[in-house]
Amino acid sequence: MDLVSSLPDDVRCHILSFLTTKESALTSVLSKKWRNLFTLVPNLDLDDSEYLHPEETKWEREEILDSFLDFVERVLSLQGNGPIRRFSLRCESGVPPARLNRWLCKVLQRGVADLELIIDFEDGYLLPRELFVSETLVNLRLKSEFGCIHWWPGAEGTFLPRLQSLDISSAMVFCDDKLQKLLPCFPVIEELRLVGMEWIDSHVTVSCATLTNQLLLSSTGSRTSKNPKSVSFDTPNLLSLAYSDLVAEDYPLVNMKSLFKARIILGVDDDQIARMRAPTNYLSEDDVVRRFGNVVKLMKGIQNVQQLHLHSDTLEVLSMCCESMPVFNNVKTLGIKSDYDRGWQAVPALLRNCPHLETLTFEGLVHHVTDKCGDACDCIFRKDKGRSLKSCPVKVVEIKEFRVTMKEMHLIEHFLDNFPCLKEMKIYREEYDPSPFGNDPQVDDLILDMIEEYKDIYSCNVQLLEPCDKWDEQ
């Protein structure tokens, strides 16, 4: 007898808990001692992708999916009513609603604490009521890449007393109640991630003192207006914020005094950007973009952060409040995502107002050139060239998505000339370079020669590196 087989059942079950349910089920053929031992494991990890292969025909795939669903049914039946800690089901081809609800009710009755569903839900599918009143759920994750997730229409009866983490991600998330009414239903929640959320009205409030680890909100807008009328945050103990939404007309309350990290995407369309760039006297008194300057209230509310990451659309919105930009005394890391059609008007104000900045990261060195571009770039000649850079104490500059163009090289030289405390510059090449010189070895050699010259001319350590991870909205 092998040493593992001689171990007690509870020890072998613990070993099996590190495997997927399919892998642990395969151990049943080892010997009688292993037969159906996997049914005692309190964690179920069921994934249809382990059964499917791209080369299979449609008929074969349907047959295999039916076999997978039958396997899930058998496993739950063999386990009986024993306690279960985790139930993870990934079936992106979908599950018949009646069957899925039967499984969910079964694991909820057995006291599941960690529930994960990655399924393309059918149109109109509603999760069972039992899920919204579970007394054992600690972590709940719902993901549907192409389908829509409907939070239970009777959500006023929701109460999940132990839920600490709620993660909902979908093409569209519908909730028939206001978020501020729903959050009290989770009295100990620490992490909230809602991706694809549609606000029920145009006034949004996120108020929760227990949120600490993370708040990720990615909204598709409001049912009643294009841009939210107001968005408020009262989360005094929150450490990490990732917020993506259409820019609101007002941010009347932003209480995030404990915030350590913020990633902000404030969406605007091309027409709104054109109006923001126009002279103020060209705008009517009731033009919504006049009120976009209220974004300064959001920035003041998060000004204690140490890590701040801003999307290219956000930079355009911030151009409406450059004069009133708050000072970010604690910011050590500033990240900027660039785009050809979005301007850098706000970048000089940001650099001036981060007096203790240590690391500056650009994802892309491209931007739309305007007469308000400021002195952070060298696109337009100015007598005070590089003034905002010369007052910036940044020590490390990271440049991602480098596309091997001379325009980028000129901007890199501009940084090297004007950042007085710069010690290190890391340049990461674009993985799929769209530029005409992306695969030209002569251009590569020229760029490498220029970078070697920089090392001789400047005290800064300049490195050309392989591609790295790109902007992460979460």
UniProtKB/Swiss-Prot annotation:
- Repeat keyword on record: yes
Matching InterPro entries: F-box-like_dom_sf, F-box_AtFBL13-like, F-box_dom, FBD, FBL60-like, LRR_dom_sf, LRR_FXL15/At3g58940/PEG3-like
| PANTHER family per the UniProt record, alphabetical | BNAANNG15180D PROTEIN, RNI-LIKE SUPERFAMILY PROTEIN
Sorted alphabetically, the keyword list is: Leucine-rich repeat, Repeat
Q: Does the keyword Repeat apply?
A: yes
LRR repeat positions in this chain?
A: 140-170, 171-196, 220-245, 281-312, 339-364
Name this protein carries in UniProt = F-box/LRR-repeat protein At3g03030
Looking at the record, the residues that make up the F-box domain are: 1-62
